[in-house]
């Protein structure tokens, strides 16, 4: 191998090493920012790392919403048809938030309660987020409840 070929090989190997390192760093950064969607059943079953940030999806239980007068602190429960999980948030809730509607909340589990730093609500009476619809459909099939296909946008 000539000196020119050796130098070229060294540069190619260095470029491959640098691109591999860059790919690994990007993958690690993205992994830390991913928030997976779980249902209350999965959370209560222990499928979630208690220290991790994740999204909780389901329906707001009717009669569970509570907000003290003059406070932003809101408490409600989310269900997937199998289990219910208490949720608290001190953020402003979206206008479309209501009991009996689908929500996706982002946050962390703390002492058995999901502390949400963001709550997203459905857009209209036919819309349910696809991930929530899929997981709710699984719960309905498990309990032999007829599954109505919501419109997914």
UniProtKB/Swiss-Prot annotation:
Keywords: Cell membrane, Cytochrome c-type biogenesis, Heme, Iron, Membrane, Metal-binding, Signal-anchor, Transmembrane, Transmembrane helix. Pfam families: CcmE (PF03100). InterPro entries: CcmE, CcmE-like_sf, NA-bd_OB-fold. The chain crosses the membrane at residues 9-29. Its main location: membrane. GO terms for cellular component: plasma membrane. Residues 30-153 are extracellular. Residues 1-8 are cytoplasmic. One of its GO terms (biological process) is cytochrome complex assembly. It is found in: Cell membrane. Belongs to the CcmE/CycJ family. HAMAP family: CcmE. This is Cytochrome c-type biogenesis protein CcmE. It comes from Stenotrophomonas maltophilia (strain K279a). The lineage of its organism: Bacteria, Pseudomonadati, Pseudomonadota, Gammaproteobacteria, Lysobacterales.
